[in-house]
Amino acid sequence: MHKDGVLIKGNREGINATIDMEKFSSFEDMLNMLIKKLSKGKHFYKGTTLILNINLSLIKKNDIKKLKESLLNEIELNEIIFEQLELEEESNKQTKIFNGVYEGKTKFIRRTVRSGQCLNYPGNIVIIGDVNSGAEVHAGGNIIVLGSLKGSVNAGNTGNKKSIIAAFLLEPEILKIADVITISPDGLEKPKYPEIAKVKDGTIIVEPYLANKYI
């Protein structure tokens, strides 16, 4: 669980939000934090399904109704599914070797993509520069950033879950591959080495980029 009590991850249907009510002094504090986090990706989350993992015994029935109505109105979600929060077991499964990336037409961008700018290309996009916070990049294939990635990116936007997103410094506001979405946790120190994001078992995972592994 994230230190602020709200953890958001992508899934096949849309997004998962896990709430730790013990982190909040009131229902209103939790609702405000959840809306604040989801609002960062409102453009991506619109029309999707939110699965909300929460200890329902700690919330009044009227507050559950208020929570659902607030999220449907503020984020414009298609549906909200409540699930009773359970402790998750750590998975000891080894990560399968990723045996390559989708290849196709590639567009090279030799500049920094600044806040407010939006790039869209049906194939792969390689950016020789940075993607600043507030910028958006959408690609039908892979997105490779030879610099820092701090904006919002959507690879495989035609439904290709084999697409990947990689960057020298991977700190996206929103990261989406096909219809699977995730956002970066706040306040975590990022490693100073290249990373690659891909879809595995319906969720997005991030791994260090190892050259001999992806050749």
Curated annotation (Swiss-Prot):
<keyword id="KW-0132">Cell division</keyword>
<comment type="subunit">
    <text>Interacts with MinD and FtsZ.</text>
</comment>
<dbReference type="GO" id="GO:0000902">
    <property type="term" value="P:cell morphogenesis"/>
</dbReference>
<dbReference type="InterPro" id="IPR055219">
    <property type="entry name" value="MinC_N_1"/>
</dbReference>
<protein>
    <recommendedName>
        <fullName>Probable septum site-determining protein MinC</fullName>
    </recommendedName>
</protein>
<comment type="similarity">
    <text>Belongs to the MinC family.</text>
</comment>
<dbReference type="GO" id="GO:0000917">
    <property type="term" value="P:division septum assembly"/>
</dbReference>
<dbReference type="InterPro" id="IPR036145">
    <property type="entry name" value="MinC_C_sf"/>
</dbReference>
<keyword id="KW-0717">Septation</keyword>
<keyword id="KW-0131">Cell cycle</keyword>
<dbReference type="Pfam" id="PF03775">
    <property type="entry name" value="MinC_C"/>
</dbReference>
<dbReference type="Pfam" id="PF22642">
    <property type="entry name" value="MinC_N_1"/>
</dbReference>
<dbReference type="InterPro" id="IPR016098">
    <property type="entry name" value="CAP/MinC_C"/>
</dbReference>
<dbReference type="GO" id="GO:1901891">
    <property type="term" value="P:regulation of cell septum assembly"/>
</dbReference>
<dbReference type="InterPro" id="IPR013033">
    <property type="entry name" value="MinC"/>
</dbReference>
<dbReference type="InterPro" id="IPR005526">
    <property type="entry name" value="Septum_form_inhib_MinC_C"/>
</dbReference>
<comment type="function">
    <text>Cell division inhibitor that blocks the formation of polar Z ring septums. Rapidly oscillates between the poles of the cell to destabilize FtsZ filaments that have formed before they mature into polar Z rings. Prevents FtsZ polymerization.</text>
</comment>
